[in-house]
Design a protein with these regions (language model features):
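Short, solvent-exposed amphipathic alpha-helices that sit
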Residues: 14-29
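C-terminal binding/interaction regions
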Residues: 4-17, 100-210
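A short beta-strand-loop structural module common to alpha/beta enzyme folds
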Residues: 29-46
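Short, structured active-site "lid" loops
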Residues: 48-67
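A short, small-residue-rich loop immediately preceding and capping a beta-strand
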Residues: 65-71, 90
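Short glycine/serine/threonine-rich phosphate/pyrophosphate-binding segments
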Residues: 15-16, 53, 75-81
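Short Gly/Thr/Asp-enriched flexible loops that form oxyanion-binding sites at enzyme active sites
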Residues: 77-90, 94-95
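Short, ordered loop/turn segments at secondary-structure junctions
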Residues: 38-39, 73-74, 97, 115-118
Length: 210
């Protein structure tokens, strides 16, 4: 699985800590991590939580990422922004049990974490435990065991609902404010990470043309 890390600007200084912790957990599992920044608070590309949502939508709908880890001060804004886009099912994770239950019950492809609220002493240990619970036990297996069948059924129903209520990502890219879109994909390493991994020719071609 290719996991993309996105940090919004208010918590950019924590990117190295989050990346190191994420890699420590998931790379031994065979997963790959692509760090889309922000890398420092002074980066030229300033990713707000709304841009984090747009970037998550681009990565997941193009196939350039299989999973997105993002967040903001509370995680709420990033979660709301991510869920604004088609093909993105984002959960808000506060503790390790959230990680396990979101993976098993909701089977999403994106998570938003609070990187300021309650992010104090031992934060890297909490992150490590969340990532182990999120990625270490598969996805969509249900919890508790007696709820597996209805939970898996409801997930399929939710996917069908989202397919109806959301527009195709390529249409959104055409209609969204183009300056906002250009700013979102102007990260230092966006091109070198995104284009080789992109599986959607229409999305890739449109963004490259910008």
């Amino acid at each position: 699985m290719r996991i993309a890390l996105i940090n919004e600007n208010s918590q950019a200084s924590k990117n190295p800590l989050i990346e190191t912790t994420l890699r420590k957990v998931v790379e031994p599992m065979g997963h790959t991590v692509d760090n889309y920044g922000m890398y420092t608070a002074d980066d030229a590309c300033q990713i707000t939580y709304v841009k984090a949502g747009l970037l998550a939508g681009i990565l997941l709908n193009s196939g350039a990422a299989d999973y997105v880890v993002t967040g903001c001060g509370t995680g709420e804004g990033a979660m709301l922004a991510c869920n604004s886009f088609p093909g993105v099912l984002c959960g808000h994770l506060v503790d390790p049990s959230d990680g396990f239950m979101f993976a098993q019950i909701n089977d999403g492809n994106c998570v938003a974490l609070p990187f300021a609220k309650d992010f104090g002493w031992g934060a890297e240990l909490k992150l490590e435990m969340i990532f182990r619970q999120l990625f270490g036990f598969g996805h969509g297996n249900g919890y508790p065991p007696e709820r597996v069948v209805p939970e898996q059924r409801n997930k399929k129903i939710l996917d069908q609902v989202k397919a109806i209520t959301h527009r195709p990502m390529i249409d959104i890219l055409h209609d969204i404010d183009q300056t906002f879109l250009k700013e979102t994909i102007s990260g230092e390493h966006f091109a070198e990470l995104f284009y080789p991994a992109c599986k959607d020719e229409a999305i890739g071609a449109y963004l490259k043309a910008l």
